[in-house]
């Protein structure tokens, strides 16, 4: 295989138009499908909460635009407000560009010319979502650049919380 991981993709989210803000109408942001990548040793058929949460959150994110009359696109984040499962501290998702995929994998042009965008969702830590809120989605995406797009329950956070920083007091 070209990639040594599972690639899960929604099917049907793009059949429904999302409600995009007026300033984005006509920009082909109204249809999308979502992708999440799991490591090859992930127990993909397990229904246990510690393993099923990526599938659950793929579904949650896919249903969100229709249920909330909203839209999802690059840089949007959704928080769970608590860790997804007891085996990780990851607690939110960011909608990102497709990484580690061939050029053109991020779009599907339908026979009628309409476009369905494909976005990857990547799990985040609470402090990474807080960073986006206090800074910007562009800064968070830049900070996440280079992380493996495959879910890693224990990947290091890309943020260092102020309360966790260790400051030295200069000696006199």
Protein language model regions, located:
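Acidic, proline/glycine-rich low-complexity IDRs
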Residues: 1-21, 25-30, 34-172
